[in-house]
Amino acid sequence: GVSKPFDEVIKHFGDPHAFGQPPVSSLRQLLSCLICPSFLEEPSYPKDIKEKARRILEATEHFSIGSYTDSLGLRIVREHVAQFITKRDGYAADPGSIFLTNGGTTGIRIALAALATGCLCSDKNKAGLMIPIPGFPHYVARIKQFNMYKIPYYLNEDNNWALDTCELERVLDESRPHCRPRGLVLINPGNPTGQVLSYDNIREVIKFCAREKLVLFADEVYQETVFTNEVQFHSCKKVLRDLGPEYNKFQLMSIHSASKGFYGECGLRGGYIEVVGFSKEVLAQFKRYLSPPHKAPSTAGQAAVSAICNPPQPGDESYETFIKEKMSIMDSYQRKAGITTKMLNSLKDVSCNAVTGSLYAFPKVILPQKAIEEAKLNNCTPDEFYCWQMLEATGINSIPGNLFGQKEGTYHFRLTILPSEEKVVPMFDRISKFHEEFIQQYRSDKDN
C-alpha cells in the first residue's frame, strides 16, 4: 500500500480497554469466581470478593451464571443498584423500579420503544422526543427505528454546553403540529461535549419537563467519570427529590452502565435503567414488555453492574487495591483532560470548552473558505474533510462534528482523552503541525 507519514492509527472512540486501560481487579475477580466457582476456594482472592460472588451464585439457578435469570435481572443485583442510588442521592431507591440491561444502549432502546409503542402512555399519535445537539447518535437511530419524531434542541456552547430553557420552549412549540411530544433526553456528563451540568441547570430542566408533561430520560452513563474538584455530578433523581413532594409524580427514567468511567468494561454489556414516577399499572406494562425470560440480560453483564454498584469498602480485604487502581485511572484522566483542553485552545481558530467529565473533547474549528469549497468538491462536509485530512496526515482518527449534530455554519470534531499519557503530547504535536499546515494551505485573503 501507499506509505503514510505515521506508524500508528489512533482511533478516537470511547472504549477504555481498547486503549490499554487496565481492568479493575475487584470486578474481574468477582467475574472469574462467577464463571469458575472453584475460584471461591482460591486463597489468593480477597475474602470479600469471594463472599459477594457466592451470594450472587446462590441467587442463580443451580449455582451457575449460565442459566437464564428473571427478565428484569437478578434481584440481588437490583438490590445492589438500589443501595448505590440511595447512597449517591440520599433518597431511597426501590429495586422493583430497577431493570438490568445489556449495556446502556439497550436501556435506551427499551425506554424509547416503550415511549413509542404506547407502553408508557395511551396516546396513539406519533411520539416526539427532544434530543440534544450535539448528542449521542444512537438516539437518532432509535428514533428512526421506532418511527418517532425527532425534536432536536441545541446545547449552549457559549455557556459550557448548558441546556437553555428558552431553546427548549422554542423547539417544543415548533414540534407540536407534527407529533405528540413525550420525552426529553438529557446527557450528563456530556457526550460528545465533555461537560458536567450544574445543579441549577438540571433543576430548570426538570421544572420545564413538569410544566410540559414530558418524561425526562437521563443518560448518566458517565456519572463516575468526573475528574475535577471544580464540578460535581448531580443525578436527575437527586435534584428531583430535592424539589419535594410536589414532584412525586414526575416521570423520570435514568440509565447507567459498566462500560464507561474508570471501569470501562464495554465488552461485558452491563447496565441498568431506573424508572420513577410511573403508576403501578404502567410499571406492570413495562415489565410485561421485558418478558419473557429469554430477554433476560447477560448474567456476566449483571455481575459487572453489581461490581460498580457494590464496590469494595474501607475495611474490605480488596479495598486498598481497588482505591489505588481507581485513583490511578482518575488522576490520569484529569491530567489528560487538562492537556487536551490546553492544547486544543492553543491552536489557531480552534476553541474548546474545558473537559470536566465523560471521556471527550468537542472543539470548534473555524475553517477557511477554500477548505469548505474543497470539501464540496469531495462530496463531504467541511468537518468530514478536515478530519479526513487529519487522518491522512497524522493517523489520528477524530470524529467529525456532523455525526453528533452542530449548529449550521459551525464545525467541530470529537477527540477522546483515552490514549495513554505517553502518547497524548506526541499526538497533539502531530495535530498541531497538521492544523497549522492545513490552515496555511487553504487560507486566502478572504479569511483575514
Predicted regions, residues:
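N-terminal low-complexity, Ser/Thr- and acidic-residue-enriched intrinsically disordered segments
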Residues: G1-Q21
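Conserved PLP-binding catalytic core of the aspartate aminotransferase-like
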Residues: A18-F19, I323-Q334, G338, L344-A393, ...
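Conserved core segment of the aminotransferase class I/II
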Residues: S26, L30, C36, D48-I56, ...
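Active-site-adjacent capping/gating segments
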Residues: I372, P382-P426
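Generic structural signal for small/hydrophobic residues in well-ordered secondary structure
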Residues: K11, V81, I98, L129, ...
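Short catalytic/ligand-binding loop motif for oxyanion handling, primarily in non-cytosolic enzymes
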Residues: H17-P23, Y139, P192-Q195, E212, ...
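Eukaryotic N-terminal low-complexity, Ser/Thr- and Lys/Arg-rich leader segments
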Residues: G1-F6, E167-P177, P245-E246, E317-T321, ...
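Conserved core of the PLP fold type I
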Residues: S25, L31-R211, F217, Q223-E246, ...
